[in-house]
Amino acid sequence: MKYLIQKKKQLRNFQKNNIVKTNKLKVKSKTENLSVIRDFVSSYAAEARIEQNIIENIILAVDEACTNIIKHAYHSVPDGEIIIKLKLSGKKFIVTITDYGNSFSPEKIPEPDLQKYYRQKKVGGLGMYLMKTLMDDVEYHSVPGKYNEVLLSKNIKVDKSNVRH
């Protein structure tokens, strides 16, 4: 399992009493790296003392985005690169996911009919819907032939039971 982790590369900027802290992870576009990505997001969010249910939502949204990148942007070719940047700025948790695979048009993806989806026992196809449901903001930027970027942000609450006094 070959992947590069640049986990301890942190930038600290002080802006009006808010610490902005960024972490970065680079992995190859292999499904076995999804667990590495989940652990990376989980440990960063837990260190920031974000409530557990919010952490779980963020992890699921990131997992969906990265799965879509592996399957659709890279067509399951394992040597593509995925870069995940995590940033905590004030009361906002921001995830930026960059890839260099094929781009797509998210506006062409229709809202799913969940009842029909369930009746037809479909598998897959709910990634964008889940990301939009779990996160407060989902953006997609693409420079075709160069890179694609998914920006996920979540307004957060700190779990006060975990705050050290």
Whereabouts are the PLM-identified features?
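Short, structured helix-loop boundary elements
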Residues: 31-34, 55, 59, 79, ...
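Conserved short strand/loop->alpha-helix "switch" segment adjacent to the catalytic nucleotide/phosphoryl-transfer site
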Residues: 41-63, 120-122
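Helix-loop-beta hinge of the Bergerat
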Residues: 18-52
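Conserved polar catalytic motif of the HATPase_c/GHKL fold
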Residues: 64, 68
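Conserved beta-strand-loop-beta-strand hairpin that lines the nucleotide-binding pocket
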Residues: 2-24, 70-165
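Short acidic/polar alpha-helix capping motifs at helix-coil junctions
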Residues: 7-8, 34-35, 46-49, 58, ...
